[in-house]
């Protein structure tokens, strides 16, 4: 009997069905326009683009009104440039993306082409469109491939990748459509907000982004902060000493919670720890583990414990070239340049005996959650998003629409087979692989870690089954292994690397076969080679289809159903036959951690024999419920963390906005004056309280403060003795004196130089104060959770204190800027000559030694902004000796944004 919900869906359709139905009329209009656009010449297509741009940018026509014509033009452009005519379902996907949704499209449905439609339409507004990919290879490939379509339509394409020059990046962002990775977009946003002038900024705004593999970037990577950092003090010796203590710990000294991936010391552990730290001298005599002074060493020991108990080699990381390379748990790929924060990475380096890199100080940071919420409109594509639809809507305001496939999915998804032990499961897996291999059916075996993929490989070697292994160790051969994975009888063991972005074609990859054949015989005629290989491929593909298509075999369930669905999605592309199954055991991590006891009792009751597996829909439902609970818990964690992140994000936007305003303003003397007056007000309130008499004023303290902050030797004691002098009179006289002082400085430096000095000091001080503030907020964040024990809401406490800290930072900023401007002065003739001699000596020494030298000391006002270091990238101090002859009116090579004569070429 049908339930009421099922009956209603049969009559009215699902919400997704209604969304799909709502755009069919638009697709029909695009199809009706097809003959009109097919009749256009190549130049006519470009002219249509120019016409659309005028209608949007000058005529005020909406993009929605223009959609049918723009999509029809884009379809024709793609047909001429690539020989590909977009299917109706691809047009649907493009419409949903333009409307600010996530289009869930299965493997092989042509998502790359789909993105061109909304990208083209939105680029007509002239504000730039960003197409976001998960790695640099895909960004370059898609930009080159789809760039042909945009060129046919008369639009420019740019691609952004690491280590480009500022000019190259600026040109890429200025293009109509820009391809880039999520990492590079985020880092460029941070770098732009550390620039000295607006002209140096690369990005031109955040109008519309299309995010490929959107669930990976906005869910899996959501909490990953992008950090631009600089080096701090080297404490490698401390990490090494702490690491030697960890193996001495017994099980009763700590408590490991696998569900939350957390490890904490017990009371016995703390006592043992204090004793050993005192013995090794890491804790000073007479100091307790609970003293505030012990916070740092306790933090390092905790990180050492986490490194040993929660991070395992070949699971969470691998060791390569004297480095710890982290592995993405969702994709199984190495994450180059990614480091764990708070000293945890250094603790792992000490554990593995590799070189310990110094910790880094955060200069600027942003999470993907907050970066992508900067865009006016956002769209995304993936093969798996439905299970996270609630999170996409709540956090990003993105709806999820499942786009129908062009051909029905012919893959058979079998129920999970559950064994009692891992040994029995592995026996079942090997038997199943052997059976499929003998029938000629290609098999993709999904594992969750490197060590498990290699353990299974050993079992297959013992069984005499030829196979390939794809994991982070063999990532260089990825393209070849994936190309061969669909061949007759092929067996491929892979970590989660094969779960996303890989297109396994039945019978193998034709293009790869053609390339290999031509490489082996360069004299062969390409057309003849292609014709022969295509004929052979068609025959092999039919044989693979007869064998059942690609068999995807999962060896464990992941915490997230999405990752499992991604693995299944490798099979059954574009209507091809296929099969998927998961082989599990009660010893698997997910089963063990999330309650295999009940299932174990059921299996015992059924009287299962050795090597038997239970296969039943009930088991699947139980597992999916467990996964849904884990997903809900992870969502709650991400949602709660986002509330904390939003506090910093609001402050970041305020600071970056203020910074941009300063860069855009030519004359900052008024801002500097406002800051000066505020500092004077604060000093008077502090030393001459309201409603107090002159004999109650702290004249001595006020005199010192005025000298220190304003650089003025004001006769405050004399003023205080005058009749009728109150706080307002003192304020007015100090303001006048400070204004006279700054006017004299401007005359001494020259107006242009003074404006440049004010801008540089303001920007440098903002950056320095923001760095300190980030560190303070990190410390507050790490301890505020304990307020919950006192029945106080940690989030409310964090908001209140973070706001107070922000106000304190702004106050400190005003004081520092005022003080620096008061101290800056032109150099005397003797100082100028001494500096020039030192500079020339350095140049001669550098030329003789052919080695870089540190730049000469400079006055505060003329010092260049330090170059931030990105973790994993090399950045050094600017070296004037290597610049050669620089014209005095040219931009300074240090990158400060000033002319050379006002920066490193200053004679004063």
From Swiss-Prot:
Gene3D superfamilies attached to this UniProt entry: Helical scaffold and wing domains of SecA, P-loop containing nucleotide triphosphate hydrolases, SecA, preprotein cross-linking domain
Catalysed conversion reaction: ATP + H2O + cellular proteinSide 1 = ADP + phosphate + cellular proteinSide 2
Main location: membrane
Protein location: Cell inner membrane; Cytoplasm
Keyword list, A-Z: ATP-binding, Cell inner membrane, Cell membrane, Cytoplasm, Membrane, Metal-binding, Nucleotide-binding, Protein transport, Translocase, Translocation, Transport, Zinc
Major enzyme class: translocase
GO biological process: intracellular protein transmembrane transport; protein import; protein targeting; protein transport by the Sec complex
Cross-referenced PROSITE patterns: SECA, SECA_MOTOR_DEAD
InterPro entries registered for this protein in UniProt: Helicase_ATP-bd (IPR014001), Helicase_C-like (IPR001650), P-loop_NTPase (IPR027417), SEC_C_motif (IPR004027), SecA (IPR000185), SecA_CS (IPR020937), SecA_DEAD (IPR011115), SecA_motor_DEAD (IPR014018)
Feature: compositional bias, Low complexity: 846-864
One of the record's GO cellular component terms: plasma membrane
Membrane association type: Peripheral membrane protein
Protein EC: 7.4.2.8
Annotated GO MF terms: ATP binding; metal ion binding; protein-exporting ATPase activity
Cofactor remark: May bind 1 zinc ion per subunit.
Subunit structure: Monomer and homodimer. Part of the essential Sec protein translocation apparatus which comprises SecA, SecYEG and auxiliary proteins SecDF-YajC and YidC.
HAMAP family: SecA
Family: Belongs to the SecA family.
Its job: Part of the Sec protein translocase complex. Interacts with the SecYEG preprotein conducting channel. Has a central role in coupling the hydrolysis of ATP to the transfer of proteins into and across the cell membrane, serving both as a receptor for the preprotein-SecB complex and as an ATP-driven molecular motor driving the stepwise translocation of polypeptide chains across the membrane.
Protein name from the UniProt record: Protein translocase subunit SecA
Organism: Cereibacter sphaeroides (strain ATCC 17023 / DSM 158 / JCM 6121 / CCUG 31486 / LMG 2827 / NBRC 12203 / NCIMB 8253 / ATH 2.4.1.)
Lineage summary: Bacteria, Pseudomonadati, Pseudomonadota, Alphaproteobacteria, Rhodobacterales
């Amino acid at each position: 009997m049908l339930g009421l919900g099922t009956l209603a869906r049969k009559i009215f359709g699902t919400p997704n069905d209604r969304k799909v139905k709502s755009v069919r009329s638009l697709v029909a209009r695009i199809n009706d326009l097809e003959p009109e656009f097919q009749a256009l010449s190549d130049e006519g297509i470009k002219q249509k683009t120019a016409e659309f741009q005028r209608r949007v940018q000058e005529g005020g026509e909406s993009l929605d009104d223009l959609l049918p014509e723009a999509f029809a033009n884009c379809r024709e452009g793609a047909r001429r440039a690539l020989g590909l005519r977009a299917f109706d379902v691809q047009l649907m996907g493009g419409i949903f993306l333009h409307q600010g949704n996530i289009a869930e499209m299965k493997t092989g449905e042509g998502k790359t082409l789909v993105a061109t439609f909304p990208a083209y339409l939105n680029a007509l507004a002239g504000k730039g469109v960003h197409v976001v990919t998960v790695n640099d290879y895909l960004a370059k490939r898609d930009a080159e491939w789809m760039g042909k379509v945009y060129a046919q339509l008369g639009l420019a394409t740019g691609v952004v990748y690491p280590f480009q020059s500022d000019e190259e990046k600026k040109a890429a962002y200025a293009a109509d459509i820009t391809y880039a990775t999520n990492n590079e977009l985020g880092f460029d946003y941070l770098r732009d907000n550390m620039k000295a002038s607006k002209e140096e900024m690369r990005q031109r705004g955040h109008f519309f982004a299309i995010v490929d593999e959107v669930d990976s970037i906005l869910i899996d990577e959501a909490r990953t902060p992008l950090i631009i950092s600089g080096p701090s003090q080297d404490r490698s010796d401390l990490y090494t000493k702490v690491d030697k203590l960890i193996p001495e710990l017994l099980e009763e000294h700590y408590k490991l919670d696998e569900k939350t991936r957390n490890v904490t010391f017990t009371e016995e552990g703390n006592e043992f720890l204090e004793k050993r730290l005192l013995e090794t001298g890491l804790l000073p005599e007479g100091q307790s583990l609970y003293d505030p002074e012990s916070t740092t060493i306790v933090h390092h020991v905790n990180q050492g414990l986490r490194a040993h108990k929660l991070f395992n080699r070949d699971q969470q990381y691998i060791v390569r070239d004297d480095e710890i390379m982290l592995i993405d748990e969702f994709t199984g790929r190495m994450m180059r340049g990614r480091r764990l924060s708070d000293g945890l990475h250094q603790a792992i380096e000490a554990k593995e005996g590799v070189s310990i890199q110094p910790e880094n100080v955060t200069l600027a940071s942003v999470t993907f959650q907050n970066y992508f919420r900067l865009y006016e409109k956002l769209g995304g594509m993936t093969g798996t998003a439905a299970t996270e639809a609630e999170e996409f809507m709540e956090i990003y305001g993105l709806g999820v629409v499942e786009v129908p496939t062009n051909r029905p999915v012919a893959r058979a998804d079998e129920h999970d087979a559950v064994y009692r032990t891992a040994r029995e499961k592995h026996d079942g897996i090997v038997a199943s692989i052997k059976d499929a291999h003998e029938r000629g059916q290609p098999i993709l075996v999904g594992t969750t870690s490197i060590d498990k993929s290699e353990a299974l490989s050993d079992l297959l070697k013992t069984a005499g089954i030829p196979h390939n292994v794809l994991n982070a160790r063999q990532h260089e051969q990825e393209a070849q292994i994936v190309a061969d994975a669909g061949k007759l009888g092929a067996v491929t063991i892979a970590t989660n690397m094969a779960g996303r972005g890989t297109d396994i074609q039945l019978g193998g990859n034709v293009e790869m076969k053609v390339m290999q054949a031509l490489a082996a015989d360069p004299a062969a005629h390409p057309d003849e080679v292609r014709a022969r290989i295509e004929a052979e491929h068609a025959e092999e593909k039919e044989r693979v289809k007869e064998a059942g298509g690609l068999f995807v075999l999962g060896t464990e369930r992941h915490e997230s159903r999405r990752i499992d669905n991604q693995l299944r999605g490798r099979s059954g592309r574009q209507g091809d036959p296929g099969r998927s199954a998961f082989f599990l055991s009660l010893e698997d991590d997910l089963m063990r951690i999330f309650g295999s006891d009940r299932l174990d009792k059921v299996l015992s009751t059924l009287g299962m024999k050795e090597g038997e597996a239970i296969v039943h829909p009930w088991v699947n439902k139980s597992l999916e419920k467990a996964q849904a609970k884990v997903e809900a818990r992870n969502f709650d964690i991400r949602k709660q963390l986002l509330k904390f992140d939003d506090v910093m994000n609001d402050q970041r936007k305020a600071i970056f906005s203020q910074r941009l305003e300063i860069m855009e303003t030519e004359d900052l003397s008024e801002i500097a004056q406002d800051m000066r007056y505020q500092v004077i007000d604060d000093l008077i309130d502090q030393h001459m309280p309201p409603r107090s008499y002159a004999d109650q004023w702290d004249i001595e303290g006020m005199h010192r403060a005025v000298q220190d902050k304003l650089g003025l030797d004001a006769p405050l004691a004399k003023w205080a003795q005058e009749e009728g002098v109150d706080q307002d009179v003192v304020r007015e006289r100090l303001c006048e004196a400070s204004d006279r002082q700054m006017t004299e400085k401007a005359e001494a430096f020259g107006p242009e130089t003074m404006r440049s000095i004010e801008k540089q000091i303001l920007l440098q001080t903002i950056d320095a104060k923001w760095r300190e503030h980030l560190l303070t907020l990190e410390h507050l964040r790490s301890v505020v959770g304990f307020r919950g024990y006192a029945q106080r809401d940690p989030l409310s406490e964090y908001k209140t204190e973070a706001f107070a800290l922000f106000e304190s930072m702004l106050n400190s900023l005003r004081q520092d800027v005022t003080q620096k401007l008061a101290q800056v002065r032109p150099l005397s003739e003797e100082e100028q000559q001494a500096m020039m001699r030192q500079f020339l000596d350095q140049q001669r020494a550098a030329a003789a030694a052919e080695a870089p030298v540190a730049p000469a000391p400079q006055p505060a006002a003329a010092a260049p902004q330090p170059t931030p270091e990105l973790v994993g990238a090399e950045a050094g101090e600017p070296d004037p000796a290597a610049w050669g002859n620089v014209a005095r009116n040219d931009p300074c090579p240090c990158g400060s944004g000033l002319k050379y004569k006002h920066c490193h070429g200053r004679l004063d």
